[in-house]
UniProtKB/Swiss-Prot annotation:
Region (Disordered): 46-66
Oxidoreductase among keywords: no
Taxonomic lineage: Bacteria, Pseudomonadati, Pseudomonadota, Gammaproteobacteria, Enterobacterales
Protein name: DNA gyrase inhibitor YacG
Family the entry assigns: Belongs to the DNA gyrase inhibitor YacG family.
Species this protein is from: Sodalis glossinidius (strain morsitans)
Pfam annotation, one family: YacG
NCBIfam families: PRK00418.1
Co-factor note (free text): Binds 1 zinc ion.
InterPro entries: DNA_gyrase_inhibitor_YacG (IPR005584), Znf_NHR/GATA (IPR013088)
Function: Inhibits all the catalytic activities of DNA gyrase by preventing its interaction with DNA. Acts by binding directly to the C-terminal domain of GyrB, which probably disrupts DNA binding by the gyrase.
Length: 66
């Protein structure tokens, strides 16, 4: 394995982050940036693109038991 230091860019703020065990929030530079990203996913500001269109009524029922 190589001892080269790999740097990545924080997806939230753009700051350089060392990709190593000493950077616990990688690829984010901090817990703050990690939580900002999580909030964007929770608010559906970010999403994985899909061609499939699902409506609320597709395969969902209040009567479904597991």
């Amino acid at each position: 394995m190589s001892d080269d230091i790999v740097n990545v860019t924080c997806p939230t703020c753009g700051k350089a982050v060392e990709w190593s065990p000493t950077s616990p929030f990688r690829p984010f530079c901090s817990k703050r940036c990690q939580l900002i990203d999580l909030g964007e996913w929770a608010e559906e500001e970010k999403r994985i693109p899909s061609d499939v269109q699902i409506t609320d009524s597709d395969e969902w029922s209040d009567e479904t038991r597991y």
